[in-house]
Amino acid sequence: MSNKKKTFEENLQDLEEIVNQLETGEIPLEEAITQFQKGMALSKDLQKTLESAEKTLVKVMQADGSEAEMDEL
């Protein structure tokens, strides 16, 4: 298993799989709790990524709607 950081899309897919598992109600309680905890952590990471992307986009756009130089990406 590599230490490569997963992309936003990969994490979102993992979260969707966890939600689907939990919605079926067919997994044991202990596993459901573990999956719920993983899902909450993924959700938090995804939210941070979205907030960071939003801040970057706000910095890029000038008040008049023109684009500024993108230094950080």
Swiss-Prot record:
Catalytic activity: Exonucleolytic cleavage in either 5'- to 3'- or 3'- to 5'-direction to yield nucleoside 5'-phosphates
Keyword Cytoplasm attributed: yes
Main location: cytoplasm
PANTHER family with a match to the protein in the record: EXODEOXYRIBONUCLEASE 7 SMALL SUBUNIT
Superkingdom assignment: Bacteria
Subunit structure: Heterooligomer composed of large and small subunits.
UniProt-annotated location(s): Cytoplasm
GO molecular function annotation: exodeoxyribonuclease VII activity
Function according to Swiss-Prot or TrEMBL: Bidirectionally degrades single-stranded DNA into large acid-insoluble oligonucleotides, which are then degraded further into small acid-soluble oligonucleotides.
Cellular component aspect of the GO annotation: cytosol; exodeoxyribonuclease VII complex
Entry EC number(s): 3.1.11.6
Keyword list, A-Z: Cytoplasm, Exonuclease, Hydrolase, Nuclease
GO biological process, one term: DNA catabolic process
Name of the protein: Exodeoxyribonuclease 7 small subunit
Disulfide bond entries: none
Family assignment from sequence similarity: Belongs to the XseB family.
Record has Nucleotide-binding as a keyword: no
